[in-house]
Amino acid sequence: MEYFNVGKIVNTQGLQGEMRVLSVSDFAEERFKKGSQLALFDDKDRFVQEVTIVSHRKQKHFDIIKFKDMYHINAIEKYKGYTLKVSKDNQGDLQEGEFYYHQIIGMAVYEKDVLIGHVKEILQPGANDVWVVKRQGKRDLLLPYIPPVVLSVDVPNKRVDVELMEGLDDED
């Protein structure tokens, strides 16, 4: 079965079995909602077990979650440093114009049919995502995911077409 990374357990939270998760999910509210099924992977990326979320809340930059049948710190402490993943079957459906991070990362980015680079990371600093584009011989380009900049995303062909607004590329 294919799994996709959605977060890392960085610490425990209190004594009642809550865990502090650093999310890398594109849809954290949906991914960590009550009843969601996730998989735990150890620090060597080996499958450990399936888990069901019974509670979720945001606290600062973390998602605080609790798993079914794990209601005490002693039951969860061993999972610090583990990765949470979602199976391909549990990803859910997307709306038009929505994409999963794993679909975007690695895509080739073009401006006027000239290759700029490849998406290496997606940041969530505020109102819109920012795609980090790795370029040959230049610093990474921070590309806001907004309509005037990102013209088209072709998932099957792993291609993004953009129009760089003035000031976006400080190396020109």
UniProtKB/Swiss-Prot annotation:
One of its GO terms (cellular component) is cytoplasm. It comes from the Bacteria. GO terms for molecular function: ribosome binding. InterPro entries: PRC-brl_dom (IPR027275), PRC_barrel-like_sf (IPR011033), RimM (IPR011961), RimM_N (IPR002676), RimM_N_sf (IPR036976), Transl_B-barrel_sf (IPR009000). An accessory protein needed during the final step in the assembly of 30S ribosomal subunit, possibly for assembly of the head region. Essential for efficient processing of 16S rRNA. May be needed both before and after RbfA during the maturation of 16S rRNA. It has affinity for free ribosomal 30S subunits but not for 70S ribosomes. Binds ribosomal protein uS19. The PRC barrel domain binds ribosomal protein uS19. This is Ribosome maturation factor RimM. It comes from Streptococcus pyogenes serotype M12 (strain MGAS9429).
